[in-house]
UniProtKB/Swiss-Prot annotation:
The gene is gnrh3. Keywords: Amidation, Cleavage on pair of basic residues, Hormone, Pyrrolidone carboxylic acid, Secreted, Signal. It comes from Pagrus major (Red sea bream). Coiled coil: none annotated. It comes from the Eukaryota. GO terms for cellular component: extracellular space. The keyword Signal applies. One of its GO terms (molecular function) is gonadotropin-releasing hormone receptor binding. Belongs to the GnRH family. This is Progonadoliberin-3. Residues 1-23 form the signal peptide.
Length: 90
């Protein structure tokens, strides 16, 4: 009886060690050193390149609209830039 319990404990210990050594030691999608895989980076760049616009639902609350509203909007009119004023020596 003592030999079988010892073997059982050893098998459980071996299973635990194997499980810990084969498990992933970093977050899913991240490589060691905090680097992302190239496939996920490519997908992120594609998503940004499409100019994806987040549309608000019809029943969006005022709090949600305030949170999604851009704070600094740059106008297309660039006439307010005057190089002579910014760089007087050129």
């Amino acid at each position: 009886m003592e030999a079988s319990s010892r073997v059982t404990v050893q098998v459980l210990l071996l299973a635990l060690v194997v499980q810990v050594t084969l498990s992933q030691h970093w977050s899913y999608g991240w490589l060691p050193g905090g680097k992302r895989s190239v496939g996920e980076l490519e997908a992120t760049i594609r998503m940004m390149g499409t100019g994806g616009v987040v549309s608000l639902p019809e029943e969006a609350s005022a709090q949600t609209q305030e949170r999604l509203r851009p704070y600094n909007v740059i106008k297309d009119d660039s006439s307010h830039f005057d190089r002579k004023k910014r760089f007087p020596n050129k």
